[in-house]
Amino acid sequence: NDLEFTELFQCDVYVYLSNHHPLAGRDKITFEELVDYPCLSFEQGDKNSFYFAEEVFSTLQYKQMIKADDRATMLNLMVGMNGYTLCSGIICEELNGDGYSAIPLETDEKMTIGYIKRKGMHISHIGKSYIEILRGYA
Protein backbone atom coordinates (compact mmCIF):
# COMPACT_ATOMS: atom_id res chain seq x y z
CA ASN A 1 0.00 0.00 0.00
CA ASP A 2 3.10 2.26 0.06
CA LEU A 3 2.08 3.87 3.35
CA GLU A 4 4.08 4.03 6.56
CA PHE A 5 3.00 4.85 10.10
CA THR A 6 5.28 6.75 12.47
CA GLU A 7 4.41 6.59 16.17
CA LEU A 8 4.91 9.81 18.09
CA PHE A 9 3.80 8.72 21.55
CA GLN A 10 1.25 6.73 23.56
CA CYS A 11 -1.24 8.36 25.90
CA ASP A 12 -4.15 7.58 28.19
CA VAL A 13 -7.73 7.48 26.91
CA TYR A 14 -10.02 10.36 27.84
CA VAL A 15 -13.78 10.93 27.76
CA TYR A 16 -14.53 14.23 26.03
CA LEU A 17 -17.84 15.77 27.07
CA SER A 18 -19.68 18.98 27.83
CA ASN A 19 -19.07 20.68 31.16
CA HIS A 20 -22.86 20.35 31.70
CA HIS A 21 -22.79 16.55 31.30
CA PRO A 22 -23.90 14.67 34.46
CA LEU A 23 -20.44 13.01 34.64
CA ALA A 24 -18.48 16.27 34.22
CA GLY A 25 -16.23 17.19 37.11
CA ARG A 26 -15.26 13.62 37.96
CA ASP A 27 -11.64 12.58 38.39
CA LYS A 28 -12.17 9.43 36.28
CA ILE A 29 -15.03 7.81 34.36
CA THR A 30 -15.72 4.09 33.80
CA PHE A 31 -17.31 2.43 30.77
CA GLU A 32 -20.20 1.36 33.01
CA GLU A 33 -20.95 5.01 33.80
CA LEU A 34 -21.09 5.82 30.06
CA VAL A 35 -23.57 3.10 29.05
CA ASP A 36 -26.68 5.30 29.12
CA TYR A 37 -25.14 8.16 27.13
CA PRO A 38 -24.67 8.28 23.35
CA CYS A 39 -21.14 7.71 22.09
CA LEU A 40 -20.28 10.15 19.29
CA SER A 41 -18.05 9.09 16.44
CA PHE A 42 -16.69 10.83 13.34
CA GLU A 43 -18.14 9.39 10.13
CA GLN A 44 -15.35 8.17 7.88
CA GLY A 45 -17.28 8.09 4.59
CA ASP A 46 -18.65 5.35 2.34
CA LYS A 47 -15.41 3.40 2.13
CA ASN A 48 -14.88 3.37 5.87
CA SER A 49 -12.60 0.79 7.40
CA PHE A 50 -12.21 0.25 11.12
CA TYR A 51 -8.46 0.19 10.42
CA PHE A 52 -8.72 3.94 9.81
CA ALA A 53 -11.05 4.75 12.71
CA GLU A 54 -9.92 7.76 14.72
CA GLU A 55 -11.55 6.64 17.94
CA VAL A 56 -10.15 4.11 20.36
CA PHE A 57 -12.48 1.16 21.05
CA SER A 58 -14.08 1.66 17.63
CA THR A 59 -14.95 -2.05 17.38
CA LEU A 60 -16.99 -2.15 20.61
CA GLN A 61 -20.77 -2.40 20.48
CA TYR A 62 -22.30 0.67 22.09
CA LYS A 63 -25.88 0.94 23.32
CA GLN A 64 -26.18 4.26 21.46
CA MET A 65 -23.81 5.40 18.70
CA ILE A 66 -24.23 8.62 16.73
CA LYS A 67 -21.98 9.39 13.77
CA ALA A 68 -21.33 12.92 12.53
CA ASP A 69 -18.93 14.33 10.00
CA ASP A 70 -18.14 17.74 11.45
CA ARG A 71 -16.89 19.17 14.73
CA ALA A 72 -19.78 21.63 15.21
CA THR A 73 -22.38 18.84 15.08
CA MET A 74 -20.34 16.74 17.52
CA LEU A 75 -20.12 19.62 19.99
CA ASN A 76 -23.86 20.34 19.70
CA LEU A 77 -24.65 16.66 20.34
CA MET A 78 -22.40 16.70 23.39
CA VAL A 79 -24.43 19.55 24.84
CA GLY A 80 -27.92 18.67 23.58
CA MET A 81 -27.84 14.90 24.16
CA ASN A 82 -25.17 14.53 26.85
CA GLY A 83 -23.05 12.69 24.30
CA TYR A 84 -19.37 11.93 24.64
CA THR A 85 -16.45 10.80 22.55
CA LEU A 86 -13.22 9.06 23.46
CA CYS A 87 -10.01 10.89 22.70
CA SER A 88 -6.34 11.49 23.50
CA GLY A 89 -7.06 14.38 25.83
CA ILE A 90 -5.33 16.79 23.44
CA ILE A 91 -7.97 19.49 23.14
CA CYS A 92 -7.82 22.77 21.24
CA GLU A 93 -9.87 25.23 23.26
CA GLU A 94 -9.48 27.84 20.50
CA LEU A 95 -11.46 25.58 18.15
CA ASN A 96 -13.98 24.03 20.54
CA GLY A 97 -14.44 26.67 23.23
CA ASP A 98 -14.07 26.25 26.98
CA GLY A 99 -17.38 24.46 27.64
CA TYR A 100 -15.90 20.97 27.36
CA SER A 101 -13.70 18.69 29.46
CA ALA A 102 -11.47 15.69 28.88
CA ILE A 103 -11.69 13.27 31.82
CA PRO A 104 -9.53 10.12 32.08
CA LEU A 105 -11.31 6.86 31.23
CA GLU A 106 -10.64 4.12 33.74
CA THR A 107 -8.87 1.59 31.51
CA ASP A 108 -5.44 0.08 31.00
CA GLU A 109 -5.68 0.71 27.25
CA LYS A 110 -3.47 3.36 25.65
CA MET A 111 -3.90 5.37 22.47
CA THR A 112 -1.07 5.47 19.95
CA ILE A 113 -0.66 8.90 18.40
CA GLY A 114 1.22 9.18 15.14
CA TYR A 115 0.96 10.00 11.48
CA ILE A 116 0.70 8.17 8.17
CA LYS A 117 2.55 9.20 5.05
CA ARG A 118 3.36 7.73 1.68
CA LYS A 119 6.74 5.93 1.68
CA GLY A 120 9.48 8.02 0.14
CA MET A 121 7.57 11.30 0.44
CA HIS A 122 9.18 14.18 2.29
CA ILE A 123 7.29 16.04 4.97
CA SER A 124 6.87 19.76 4.33
CA HIS A 125 8.21 22.41 6.70
CA ILE A 126 4.66 23.07 7.95
CA GLY A 127 4.12 19.33 8.42
CA LYS A 128 7.33 19.05 10.46
CA SER A 129 6.24 22.01 12.61
CA TYR A 130 2.88 20.34 13.26
CA ILE A 131 4.57 17.07 14.22
CA GLU A 132 6.83 18.92 16.68
CA ILE A 133 3.78 20.56 18.27
CA LEU A 134 2.20 17.11 18.67
CA ARG A 135 5.40 15.73 20.23
CA GLY A 136 5.06 18.46 22.85
CA TYR A 137 2.01 16.65 24.23
CA ALA A 138 3.97 13.47 24.96
Each language-model region and where it sits:
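Beta-alpha-beta core module
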Residues: D2-D12, A72-G120
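Secondary-structure junction motif
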Residues: F31, D36-L60, I123-I131
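Conserved glycosyltransferase catalytic-site signature
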Residues: F50, D70-A72
